[in-house]
C-alpha cells in the first residue's frame, strides 16, 4: 500500500476502502469520501453523522464503512476526523466543475473568492481551485472546513490547497 510507503494513496487503492462511494453515487450529488485505511482506535466520524451513514461497528479499530445512500453530504464528519481523512465531493456542482470540502488547519486561512493551487494527495499542484466557502465553527476546535471548486476531472484528486502569496 502506497500510504505506508509514500504517505498517500494511489487512486486505484481508494477503490478498496469501505468509505469510498461508488462512481454511480458520486454522480448523484454531494457525498462523503472517507480515505481512512488505518485500523486504529477511532470513531468520531460515526458519532458526528446524524444520518448514520458512517459505521465503525463493534470494534473501535474497524475501518469506517460508508452507506452512501444515507449520506446527504452535509460535511459534519469532516472536522470530526482527527486524521483529516474525510472529504465531501460534489461532482455535479456545474457542468464543468466539482466541489471538494476538506479540513484545513493552516494560517493564514484563505478567503472566499481566492484562487489557490489545488493539491493532490502527494501535495502536487494539479489545477487552480476557487475558494467558495470557509467555515470555522467553534465545535470544530479551530479546524476550518474549506469548500473549493475545481475542474470536474480533479474532483476525486484535489485534497488540499496552497494559498498563493500576494505581492503587496
Question: Where are these predicted regions, by residue range?
Answer:
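Short, well-ordered loop/turn sites that connect or cap secondary structure elements
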Residues: 109-111
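Short beta-strand-centered aromatic/proline hotspots
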Residues: 124-138
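Short, solvent-exposed secondary-structure boundary/capping segments
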Residues: 136-150
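Local cysteine-cluster metal-coordination motifs and their immediate loop/turn environment
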Residues: 40-52, 69-84
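Short, charged beta-turn/beta-strand-edge "cap" motif at the junction between a beta-strand
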Residues: 85, 120-125
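Intrinsically disordered, low-complexity, charged/polar segments
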Residues: 160-168
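Ferredoxin-like iron-sulfur electron-transfer modules
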Residues: 19-41, 54-73, 90-105
Amino acid at each position: 500500500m502506497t500510504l505506508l510507503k509514500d504517505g498517500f494513496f494511489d487512486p486505484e487503492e481508494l477503490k478498496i476502502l469501505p468509505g469510498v462511494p461508488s462512481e454511480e453515487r458520486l454522480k448523484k450529488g454531494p457525498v462523503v469520501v472517507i480515505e481512512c485505511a488505518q485500523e486504529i482506535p477511532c470513531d468520531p466520524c460515526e458519532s458526528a453523522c446524524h444520518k448514520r451513514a458512517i459505521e465503525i461497528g463493534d470494534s473501535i479499530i474497524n475501518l469506517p464503512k460508508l452507506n452512501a445512500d444515507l449520506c446527504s453530504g452535509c460535511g459534519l464528519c469532516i472536522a470530526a476526523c482527527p486524521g483529516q481523512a474525510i472529504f465531501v465531493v460534489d461532482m455535479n456542482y456545474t457542468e464543468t466543475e466539482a466541489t471538494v470540502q476538506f479540513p484545513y488547519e493552516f494560517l493564514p486561512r484563505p478567503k472566499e473568492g481566492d484562487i489557490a493551487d489545488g493539491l493532490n494527495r502527494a501535495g502536487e499542484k494539479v489545477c487552480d481551485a476557487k475558494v467558495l466557502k470557509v467555515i470555522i465553527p467553534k465545535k470544530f476546535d479551530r479546524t476550518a472546513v474549506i469548500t473549493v471548486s475545481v475542474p470536474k476531472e480533479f474532483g476525486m484528486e484535489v485534497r488540499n490547497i496552497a494559498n498563493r502569496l500576494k505581492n503587496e
